[in-house]
């Protein structure tokens, strides 16, 4: 059996699946339910002194959409769109204090952790909230620099408004890190192009790690009524956003090398694996639990355990970042990889007259032959589109040899270049020889 435990910023987690800061952590009762379901941790819904952000949660609105841009009506598919408007914890901080110590003990007795989340009105209130969290014994705090809603709240400056400004994010982070001893993790907003700059700024300011990422701000329309859903802009996320979240996990892991929790894009254990392999050993699960209930949580944890056993991963560390470490650093590396071309297996092509592969090849590399589809190697650029549009799995990619590729690029190469096997050292050297001798 795989070891799901891990150390994240000095805190030991029994498994990497943490319940994100949202409605599922907005009450002591549901937090206990998360503990009982086996969560590695729970991040409390953001504690705040911003009254309007607490009031917003008391007036939350949701529009959960399917692939047809219609309300799901009880049918939760994997690619749902979670469009909603909600704020910070609807319970005042002073009312949370009596519960935090008890909940933290309840969690730790079962090998789990209650993690704080803060969203202040001023720098001093950020400090005060985090000190309260620390005084209650919580082992870690997340600063919510990612919430998309403050930008739509007149007079409110917080959430993504801080997370979009590296200098402000650095200042708040530094002040909080000076004030508390527990690890401080920053939740980043994807509503910008400077995510890496902000991550670098908070790292320099003392942050122990980052969460990549919160949700986006979106706009959705009901075309039957012509009205904006929920009346206008709202937060938007879901599994469809996973690749966007992973982009930032990849860059932060590769370029900054700091601890990351992954968020925004998890439905099942396979998504958890993607985040871990990209570089986020700890993951936050949120919207799917709101749609399927806390009882769904064990299936994610058990699925991860089974996956690791089947694929031979002994622990979380053995998976962490393996995809990012093998990723190209820039698109130029793609040009140095072996050239590929498609081949059609006529026996597998059950209906050559369907021609979908030909219709979706925009390089004239496929053509209708005598009762079959023919591949024209000289035109094929190796994009692999045909392997995905063919309904019969009749196409496959093959490596184009250096000689074949050189012949495609240089039409007047003298034969003696090939006679001495001058291309054995690789394509780039072969091309140089072809240029000289051609």
Task: Place the predicted regions along the sequence by residue.
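C-terminal accessory/binding modules appended to enzymatic or scaffolding proteins
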Residues: 338-370
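Short linker/helix segments within small regulatory modules
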Residues: 369-377
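Flanking helices and flexible, charged tails adjoining ferredoxin-like Fe-S electron-transfer domains
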Residues: 304-314, 318-334, 346-347, 351, ...
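N-terminal capping/small domains of soluble enzymes
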Residues: 1-127
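Alpha/beta enzyme core
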Residues: 32-37, 41, 109-110, 121-261, ...
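C-terminal helical cap(s) of enzyme catalytic domains, especially alpha/beta-barrels
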Residues: 51-71, 219-237, 288-313, 407-414
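Extended, hydrophobic interaction surfaces within ordered domains
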Residues: 250-256, 271-327, 381, 385-388
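Short secondary-structure boundary segments
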Residues: 45-47, 145, 214, 287-288
């Amino acid at each position: 059996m795989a070891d799901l435990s891990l150390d994240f910023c000095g805190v030991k987690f029994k498994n990497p699946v943490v319940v994100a800061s949202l409605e599922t952590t907005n009450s002591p009762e549901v937090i206990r339910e998360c503990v009982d379901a086996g969560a590695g941790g729970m991040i409390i819904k953001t504690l705040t002194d911003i009254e309007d952000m607490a009031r917003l949660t008391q007036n939350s609105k949701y529009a959960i959409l399917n692939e047809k841009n219609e309300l799901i009506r009880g049918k939760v598919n994997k690619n749902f769109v979670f469009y909603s408007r909600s704020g910070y914890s609807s319970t005042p901080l002073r009312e949370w204090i009596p519960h935090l110590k008890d909940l933290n003990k309840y969690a730790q007795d079962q090998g789990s952790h209650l993690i704080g989340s803060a969203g202040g009105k001023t720098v001093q209130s950020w400090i005060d909230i985090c000190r309260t969290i620390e005084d209650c014994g919580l082992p870690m705090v997340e600063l919510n620099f990612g919430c998309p809603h403050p930008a739509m709240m007149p007079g409110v400056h917080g959430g993504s408004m801080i997370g979009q400004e590296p200098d402000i994010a650095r200042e708040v982070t530094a002040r909080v890190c000076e004030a508390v001893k527990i690890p401080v993790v920053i939740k980043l907003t994807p509503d910008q192009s400077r995510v890496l700059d902000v991550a670098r700024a908070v790292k320099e300011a003392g942050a122990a790690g980052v969460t990549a990422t919160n949700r986006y701000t979106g706009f959705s329309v009901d075309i039957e009524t012509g009205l904006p859903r929920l009346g206008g802009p709202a937060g938007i996320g879901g599994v469809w956003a996973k690749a966007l979240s992973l982009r930032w996990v990849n860059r932060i892991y590769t370029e900054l090398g700091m601890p990351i929790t992954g968020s925004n894009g998890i439905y099942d254990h396979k998504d958890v694996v993607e985040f871990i392999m990209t570089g986020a050993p700890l993951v936050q699960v949120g919207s799917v639990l709101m749609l399927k209930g806390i009882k769904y949580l064990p299936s994610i944890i058990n699925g991860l355990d089974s996956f690791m056993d089947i694929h031979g991963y002994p622990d979380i560390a053995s998976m962490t970042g393996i995809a990012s470490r093998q990723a190209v650093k820039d698109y130029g590396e793609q040009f140095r990889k072996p050239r590929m071309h498609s081949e059609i297996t006529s026996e597998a092509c059950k209906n050559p007259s369907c021609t979908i592969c030909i219709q979706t090849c925009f390089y004239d590399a496929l053509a209708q032959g005598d009762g079959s589809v023919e591949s024209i190697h000289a035109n094929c650029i190796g994009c692999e589109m045909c392997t995905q549009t063919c309904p019969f799995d009749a196409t496959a990619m093959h490596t184009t040899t250096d000689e074949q590729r050189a012949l495609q690029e240089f039409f007047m190469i003298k034969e003696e270049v090939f006679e001495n096997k001058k291309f054995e050292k690789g394509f780039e050297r072969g091309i140089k020889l072809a240029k000289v001798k051609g």
